[in-house]
């Protein structure tokens, strides 16, 4: 988010204004280098106050934006899922629950039911597993008409199995599964 980037720059002693950073973000979008998705909410004020999540237009651009120098496969997988959702012509937003948990995507295409999508590289770390599942569960309780879906890079089902009504699918199978309905 712009706020995080602003805080990072300020902590490094680099003077910059938030308006300038928002303008630069707009330039990057105009140049088709990044895309942003907004918070799903009925309140325009809430949407404006909460930062948009930014993603590169192509997972291959992630090393350019990644400052640690390490590969970020989780972010690459999220970006690939977002690109596919947009290719499918779905409206995409992210969800923040009342508890403060975030779900990566809410994909909507009326009259179909919305789909809550949480993307996770793998669930082998118990802390990661708990965080990802708890966020998806909380969002599915707040949006009972939405199908909660967890996508992972792993091709083996998570153990122990996910609680109802959460569904799991390997990301590769999901990416290849669109029927255009």
Positions of PLM-derived features:
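Conserved beta-strand segments of alpha/beta enzyme cores
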Residues: 91, 147, 165-167
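Short, hydrophobic beta-strand segments that form beta-sheet elements in well-ordered domains
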Residues: 144-153
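Accessory nucleic acid-recognition modules appended to NTPase machines
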Residues: 1-113
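Hydrophobic, well-ordered secondary-structure elements that form the walls
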Residues: 85, 104-105, 117, 136, ...
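Short, charged, amphipathic alpha-helix that recurs within catalytic cores of restriction-modification
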Residues: 122, 129-144
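Active-site ExK catalytic segment of metal-dependent nucleases
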Residues: 108, 114-124
């Amino acid at each position: 988010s712009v706020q995080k980037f602003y805080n990072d720059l300020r902590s490094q002693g680099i003077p910059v204004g938030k308006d300038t950073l928002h303008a630069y973000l707009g330039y990057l979008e105009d140049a088709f280098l990044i895309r942003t998705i907004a918070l799903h909410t009925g309140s325009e004020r809430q949407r404006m106050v909460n930062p948009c999540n930014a993603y590169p237009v192509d997972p291959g651009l992630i090393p350019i934006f990644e400052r640690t120098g390490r590969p970020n496969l989780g972010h690459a997988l999220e970006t690939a899922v977002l690109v596919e959702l947009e290719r499918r012509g779905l409206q995409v937003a992210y969800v923040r629950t009342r508890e403060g948990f975030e779900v990566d995507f809410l994909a909507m295409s009326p009259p179909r039911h919305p789909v809550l999508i949480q993307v996770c590289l793998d669930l082998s770390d118990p802390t990661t597993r708990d965080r990802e599942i708890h966020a998806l569960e909380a969002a599915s309780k707040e949006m009972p008409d939405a199908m909660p879906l967890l996508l992972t890079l792993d091709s083996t089902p998570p153990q122990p199995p996910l609680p109802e009504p959460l569904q799991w699918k390997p990301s590769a199978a999901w990416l290849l599964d669109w029927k255009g309905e």
